[in-house]
Amino acid sequence: MYIVCVSIIIVCIWGCLGNGTVIWLLGFRIQRTPFTTYILNLAIADFGLLAVDFTLEIRWLQNRKQDEGIVFEFFEDIFQCMYNTGQFLLTAISIDRCVCILFPLWYRCYRSPRLSTILCALIWIFSFIFPGIHFILFLTAKKEHKYIRCYQYIVNGFICLPLMTFSTLILFIKFCFKTQRIRRRKLITVILLTLLFFLSFSFPMNAFYISHYIFESPTLHRIQYGYLCATLNSSVNPLIYFLVGRPKRGKPRRSMKVILQNVFKEEESHPDETAPSAETKL
């Protein structure tokens, strides 16, 4: 447990630095687009999750046991809110890219530029519902608060997992059958890698929580490994942006700002992606 806890703390520090850089650049240094609104909110959710988890792990190192009480439950519910937000945002991102690929003409001509902002606001509000109910029930000493998180993870599993898996498959199939020019697009590569890492790292925590509340299995060790997977998932996205967006060998190095611009402003500089679909419909 000590090794896992220290590993989580190291990953949290690294992830906070990466996501903090993304938040600073996308929020204040780079002109925002509808799609980068999703990425900015995702970075905020990941940063919040890592900061809260860092606090929880420090408290565990001090006490060497599972913390309890109002302070712990408050931070735990904030963690759950950030975790929910990340899941729903990635689901929205995957659906957004699928619509962009399957219906490119409609996406460019009729999609509202404010849609991403509205969806992000709704996702944040919805993500607070289950943790908020859990904290209120905890304060009123209701035993039902123990099962709220189980319901939360069941809802996440039935909503996010099928939609994200289906969208990832569509994106992967389209990516494989596109021309070499489109296949080299960095944005679709970033999205696919982000979704694959999320499906690999983030959903084990759903399984750990559901198995605990349904089968009443011991939690501490399993939940710690779930936290480790969640922190890895929240920390890996800035690294993906950097590795995919960096220039090839032999070319001069670029700043992180230029790398993010190359990755997330790609769809604006490639309007010809919709040409085949438009010509087919005409």
Regions of interest found by a model, annotated:
Residues C5-C12, L25, G48-K65, F79, ...:
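Helix-to-loop junction signature of class
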Residues L199, F203-I210, T219-T280:
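Seventh transmembrane helix
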Residues L40-A43, T117-A121, Y151-V155, I188-L196:
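Internal alpha-helical transmembrane segments of multi-pass membrane proteins, especially GPCRs
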